[in-house]
Amino acid sequence: MKPLILVLNGPNLNMLGTREPAQYGHETLADLAQGCADTAHAHGLEIEFRQTNHEGELIDWIHAARGRCAGIVINPGAWTHTSVAIRDALVASELPVIEVHLSNVHKREPFRHLSFVSSIAVGVICGLGSHGYRMALSHFAELLQERAA
């Protein structure tokens, strides 16, 4: 059985391709999901790719990942800067987490510079567009190979 990585996307990411394309690009969420699926397949991983605009739903998905998934790639969107609950759920999952952002949050408004997730993540990738998700999945493949050796 292939290791399962949960790829989570927070609020407004369903609007990719039409929302602020200068900031987030022209790729849609479906394009992003397909790129992640292709990368996962190439590395012998499976993914569950999800997006929600409801914080409690995201937390439920994180809770359900414990003991079932090998890791979590998460773009919490605006919740990055506001949600202690998501941070606590990620800690409770006891899974390695990679935080991803399409835009370089450090080149944007000061309130976007704070992340409640970064301090508990094994890595943070921002500003590389959808390539950041693929990099995160590639890293998980390497991490899992190292653990298996």
UniProtKB/Swiss-Prot annotation:
Entry's EC annotation: 4.2.1.10
Organism name: Pseudomonas putida (strain ATCC 47054 / DSM 6125 / CFBP 8728 / NCIMB 11950 / KT2440)
Domain of life from the UniProt record: Bacteria
Family of the protein in this entry: Belongs to the type-II 3-dehydroquinase family.
Xref: HAMAP family: AroQ (MF_00169)
Binding site for substrate: 75, 81, 88, 102-103, 112
Keywords: Amino-acid biosynthesis, Aromatic amino acid biosynthesis, Lyase
Covalent S-S links between cysteines: none
Transmembrane stretches, start-end: none
Protein name in UniProt: 3-dehydroquinate dehydratase 2
Chemical reaction(s) catalysed: 3-dehydroquinate = 3-dehydroshikimate + H2O
Active site feature: 24 (proton acceptor), 101 (proton donor)
Chain's role: Catalyzes a trans-dehydration via an enolate intermediate.
GO term, biological process aspect, one: chorismate biosynthetic process
Keyword Lyase: yes
Subunit text: Homododecamer.
Site feature location: Transition state stabilizer: 19
Keyword ATP-binding assigned: no
Pfam families with a match to the protein in the record: DHquinase_II (PF01220)
Metabolic or biological pathway: Metabolic intermediate biosynthesis; chorismate biosynthesis; chorismate from D-erythrose 4-phosphate and phosphoenolpyruvate: step 3/7
InterPro entries: DHquinase_II (IPR001874), DHquinase_II_CS (IPR018509), DHquinase_II_sf (IPR036441)
Gene Ontology MF annotations: 3-dehydroquinate dehydratase activity
PROSITE patterns for this protein: DEHYDROQUINASE_II
